[in-house]
Structure formats: C-alpha cells, structure tokens
Amino acid sequence: VEVDCSRFPNTTNEEGKDEVVCPDELRLICGTDGVTYNHECMLCFYNKEYGTNISKEQDGECGETVPMDCSRYPNTTSEDGKVTILCTKDFSFVCGTDGVTYDNECMLCAHNVVQGTSVGKKHDGECRKELAAVSVDCSEYPKPACPKDYRPVCGSDNKTYSNKCNFCNAVVESNGTLTLNHFGKC
C-alpha cells in the first residue's frame, strides 16, 4: 500500500536538506522491507532520507515468523546417522528470517537440518531486496556533535544507532566496515 507522504510537513535540516517532520505518536506499521516503523510518517522519512521506495505492507508490527511444519516432508537417515530431508525441485519461494530466499519451504527445512540452524519462515515469496541498493552517504562525517532526534537505523554490527549522524560517525570510526542492516531498531 502506497503511503501518501504529502500529508506530512517538511522542513529544512541543519545540512540544508528537505526532511519529513513526524509526530511523536505511535501507530506501528509494517513496511514492505519487513521492518516495523513507529508511524507511516517515519516510513516517509526513511524513503526521503535514503532514496528508497518502501511501501506499507500492513498496519501493526511486522510478524517475526510464519509457522511451518517440517515434519510433513519425507526424510531418510544415512548409515552414519545423518538425516536428509527429501525435497522436490518445485519453485514456491519462501523468505527465511536470515534474509535468504529458498526455493520452497522444504528446502528451508532441509537447510536447517544440514546446517543445524533454526531459520524461520518470514513470509511466502522471495525476500524483498529494497534495502540491497541502499547505502548511506556518510561523506560529510564525522561530526563533533549529533542532533538528539531519534530516527533509528540498525548497523551490520546489530547495534541500534539513534540517527544517521551517530551511525555515520560509527561508519567512519570503523573505516567503512560498518554498513546499514536495515531501518528501525535492531
């Protein structure tokens, strides 16, 4: 669902860039990137700030996982005791909570058995790649002081940074090894 961002006011920030001004109220929505936003306005803010085109998937928080029953897939045990799940080659893509697209639910179950992991099913269909092309421009950083506004981003270190300024300062400090994981809290 496309969010009408024109209903939220804009202002010019200290860097001279247009910025969406959001109310403090909490009306959680789930974006098509699988991230929960505090308000439709915050989704508009991130789209403007980072040049993305994320839409609203639904009202309320994003669901963590969708139930899946791996016991329904046939399996075999080899002589050395290794269990293998037997999957078809059907393409009925599912997105794992690890951000990887699996050919079908059975292949996700098989991955967990082989790797000894417990990756859940985030949703049916391919994982969305909205964030794959998103990079944060930190060329104007580091800055000696950052504003106190709370517009969280999650870094590749699984740490929540309160805003772009704090995140970019950390990127510079990491010599560029820190990247954007997703918008919102980790």
UniProtKB/Swiss-Prot annotation:
Glycosylation sites (chain numbering): N10, N53, N75, N175
Domain Kazal-like: 1-64, 65-129, 132-186
Phosphoprotein as UniProt keyword: no
Main location: secreted
GO MF annotations, alphabetized: serine-type endopeptidase inhibitor activity
Site residues (Reactive bond 3 for trypsin), renumbered to this chain: K148, D149
CDD domains in the cross-refs: KAZAL_FS
Keyword Metal-binding applies: no
Site (Reactive bond 2 for trypsin): K89, D90
Pfam families per record: Kazal_1
Compartmental location: Secreted
Gene3D superfamilies reported for this sequence: 3.30.60.30
Disulphide bridges, residue numbers: C5-C44, C22-C41, C30-C62, C70-C109, C87-C106, C95-C127, C138-C168, C146-C165, C154-C186
GO CC annotations on file: extracellular region
UniProt domain comment: Avian ovomucoid consists of three homologous, tandem Kazal family inhibitory domains. The first domain does not inhibit any tested protease. Domains 2 and 3 inhibit trypsin.
UniProt name for this protein: Ovomucoid
